[in-house]
UniProtKB/Swiss-Prot annotation:
One of its GO terms (biological process) is purine ribonucleoside salvage. Belongs to the purine/pyrimidine phosphoribosyltransferase family. Xpt subfamily. It is found in: Cytoplasm. GO terms for cellular component: cytoplasm. This is Xanthine phosphoribosyltransferase.
């Protein structure tokens, strides 16, 4: 997605060897017009897949997921990373390791929001090692629902997340694919769209 790649080049900042900071439009401050375009692109791609729910993990996946769900006219569910006293029965959980934060969290979704009839599109901000998506898949499958596909805003193609998910049989669609960082610049791999 050229619009996204251009924004990454303009406002993204490389930290170290493998971290791209995009807090000015995705991971802290949100550019709603860009997120709306991202949501439209995902919705167009998956319009024929019969999606009934969009699922993400808090926090930075929420913006692209909500605009995708809006464009598909389906509910969006986000997995919570912190235990909540109001979520006390029928909770589906999985362990998720965060590459950026270097911590493992128990993420959860109330089981009442997913059913065996649901066809789910997972949307997330980044794909690195695939652990967030893997945790969401576990939760969705605990409910008996089906993961139709995984939509990623920014994929770190130099990490193994995509291979892990595709080898497990889950289609991955990434709007921007980072091949590497070179001389302080992002080098893109051809994106899926």
């Amino acid at each position: 997605m050229k619009l996204l790649e251009d924004r990454i080049l303009k406002d993204g900042h490389i930290l170290g060897d493998n971290i791209l900071k995009v807090d000015s439009f995705l991971t802290h401050q949100v550019d709603f017009s860009l997120m709306r375009e991202i949501g439209k692109v995902f919705a167009e791609k998956f319009a024929a897949a019969g999606i009934t729910k969009v699922v993400t993990i808090e926090a930075s996946g929420i913006a692209p997921a909500v605009f995708t769900a809006e464009a598909l006219n389906v509910p969006m569910i986000f997995a919570k990373k912190a235990k909540n006293i109001t979520m006390n029965e029928g909770i589906l959980t999985a362990q998720v390791y965060s590459f950026t934060k270097q911590v493992t969290s128990t993420v959860s979704i109330a089981g009442k929001f997913l059913s065996p009839e649901d066809k789910v599109l997972i949307i997330d901000d980044f794909l690195a090692n695939g652990q967030a998506a893997k945790g969401l898949i576990q939760i969705i499958e605990q409910a008996g629902a089906t993961v139709q596909a995984i939509g990623i805003v920014i994929e770190k193609s130099f990490q193994d997340g995509r291979d892990l998910l595709e080898k497990a049989g889950y289609p991955v669609l990434s709007l921007a694919r980072l091949d590497r960082f070179e001389n302080g610049q992002v080098v893109f791999k051809e994106a899926d769209l």
